Swiss-Prot record:
Pfam families: SIR2_2 (PF13289), STALD (PF18185)
Annotated protein name in UniProt: NAD(+) hydrolase ThsA
InterPro entries per the UniProt record, alphabetical: DHS-like_NAD/FAD-binding_dom (IPR029035), Ssirtuin_cat_dom (IPR026590), ThsA_STALD (IPR041486)
GO BP terms, alphabetized: defense response to virus
Biological classification of the source: Bacteria, Pseudomonadati, Pseudomonadota, Gammaproteobacteria, Moraxellales
Family: Belongs to the soluble Thoeris ThsA family.
Chain's role: NAD(+) hydrolyzing component (NADase) of the Thoeris antiviral defense system, composed of ThsA and ThsB (maybe J591_1492). As purified, has NADase activity that is not activated by any tested cADPR isomers; binds 3'cADPR better than 2'cADPR. It was suggested the purified protein is already in a fully active state. Upon activation binds and hydrolyzes NAD(+), leading to cell death and inhibition of phage replication.
């Protein structure tokens, strides 16, 4: 379960994702679980050389500057960056979750490449920006822009880390300041693993607050609650608890709403819930039909067309592999509704991917179709299963036989592995009825902790109807309760 403020944040982020208005700002805390050090640990060996206690220091930017002043250069500082941040590491579970979402804008003060690597692992193209010249260049086919406002581990000698660099940042990196200011005005940000004592960010947030006063865009930040177990005495715990409260109130000046969590694994739970909720706005239809049972082809196609219309009306995006005898009518209804509503971009509401037919080798074809199915299902949250039969021909006798569609069975298992909500329409018969019975026989496995009301609505999908169009309200009731 999620707390009230967590639920509100999740609702808002899902809405912003649907409208392509969501962005991430990643701080050092997001990369820490991968093994990268925070600023304090990065500078600890250097503070020892300065005979200072890093645990007593709060102004780490000044500490880095002290070291440069004393050593007449930043060579040792650059070496520390190479040693600690230049080491390749794997993205964390949180990076992986974020990379699966349709987030087109990332900002970070981190030098590591975990965001870019996570995007690459998802087959997405990251357009990385960490110099002024990068801002005027656009990577072909990019999926997301990653703004690294403090530099990149590949150029450690240019990384922003000293007080001199921070003070001159608005002058030397003015295009980054302008770009971030624009995104903070037009997008809703989620700040993760971030410390708000960064002078650059403080400067930018202050400028936006002054310009927009009470009309600033709402942003979110996730903080872990100050925990007594982290402190050796009550005095330190009380002090840091009070300080966190002050920071939360101060961030409200910049329209940044802080949402507290008990432990860092709660962050993963929240991101998973956001992903699940977002994906549940995308419905996949699995099905094929060579014969249409007692309903007949005309009534079945009318129902499928109406189903496509209704899902678009309800604000869903639909995905289809254009199954034989099923997909065309379903897609036609959706397209008609999209045009009736004068939506300008069909791709925002509809994804069609026809299965490649002309692959001669059966083994290769099967592997390609499996990969195709995984790709189709990966961005959806609900899978409907309808009918599911096909015709096979005996190569010797030439006799044709109607059999259950094994492809639907594979789509069912892939969808289950990906965590989709599975809705076989048992009343349509064939493979869909078989899959319906499979779920009902082990309902708590497929729908753990579901309400009696949901199960009752689900079971109605198996009730026989004389006209398939009568299934529309039953399907709607099940989806509404998910």
């Amino acid at each position: 379960m999620f707390e009230h403020e967590q639920k509100i944040m999740i609702d808002r982020i899902v809405k912003e994702l649907e409208e392509n208005n969501f962005a991430i700002f990643a701080g050092a805390g997001l990369s820490a679980p991968a093994g990268y050090v925070n600023w304090k640990e990065l500078l600890r060996p250097l503070s020892i050389e300065l005979n200072l206690d890093i645990d007593k220091e709060t102004d780490l930017v000044s500490l880095a500057q002290y070291y440069v002043n004393e050593n007449h250069g930043r060579n040792r500082l650059t070496e520390r960056l190479i040693d600690e941040v230049g080491v390749a590491r794997e993205p964390t579970p949180n990076h992986k979750i974020l990379a699966k979402l349709p987030i087109s804008t990332y900002w970070t003060t981190n030098y590591d490449d975990l965001i870019e690597k996570a995007l690459d692992n998802e087959g997405k193209i990251a357009d990385k920006k960490f110099t002024k010249n990068h801002l005027s260049q656009t990577k072909k086919g990019r999926s997301a822009v990653v703004y690294k406002m403090h530099g990149d581990a590949s150029l450690p000698d240019q990384a922003i880390i000293t007080k001199d660099q921070y003070e001159s940042y608005p002058l030397h990196f003015a295009p980054f300041v302008t770009a971030l200011s624009g995104d903070l005005v037009s997008k809703t940000f989620l700040f993760l693993g971030f410390s708000f004592n960064d002078p650059n960010l403080d400067y930018i947030l202050s400028r936006i607050r002054i310009h927009f006063e009470q009309n600033q865009r709402q942003h979110y930040c996730i903080f872990r609650k100050v925990n007594r177990a982290d402190y050796s005495n009550d005095e330190d715990f009380s002090y840091n608890l009070l300080k966190q409260q002050f920071v939360i109130k101060d961030l409200a000046r910049f329209s940044i709403k802080v949402v507290l969590i008990d432990a860092w694994n709660d962050l993963t739970r929240i991101l998973e819930e956001i992903t699940k909720r977002f994906r549940c706005k995308n419905v996949f239809l699995s099905g094929s039909a060579h014969e249409f049972g007692s309903w007949g082809q005309t009534a079945t196609e009318l129902f499928l067309s109406k189903l496509g219309e209704v899902l678009i009306q309800e604000g869903f995006k639909i995905t289809s592999g254009l199954g034989l005898g099923i997909g065309n009518a379903f897609i036609s209804g959706a397209i008609k509704e999209i045009y009736n509503r004068k939506y300008t971009k069909i791709d925002d509401y509809l994804t069609m991917k026809v299965f490649p037919q002309f692959v001669a080798d059966p083994t290769e074809r099967k592997n390609i179709w499996t990969a195709w199915r995984k790709d189709l299902l990966s961005q959806t949250g609900i899978a409907l299963f309808f009918m599911g039969n096909k015709i096979i021909k005996d190569p010797e006798s030439g006799k044709q036989t109607i059999v259950l569609a094994d492809g639907m069975d594979e789509e069912f298992h892939i969808a289950h592995e990906l965590g989709l909500k599975l809705i076989p329409i048992g009343a349509s018969g064939y493979k869909a009825k078989e899959l319906f019975n499979q779920i009902i026989s082990d309902f708590d496995h497929y729908y753990p902790n579901s309400s009696p009301k949901f199960r009752e609505a689900f079971e109605k999908l198996n009730e026989e109807v004389d006209e398939p169009v009568k299934l529309l309200s039953k399907i709607h009731d099940v989806i509404k309760l998910i």
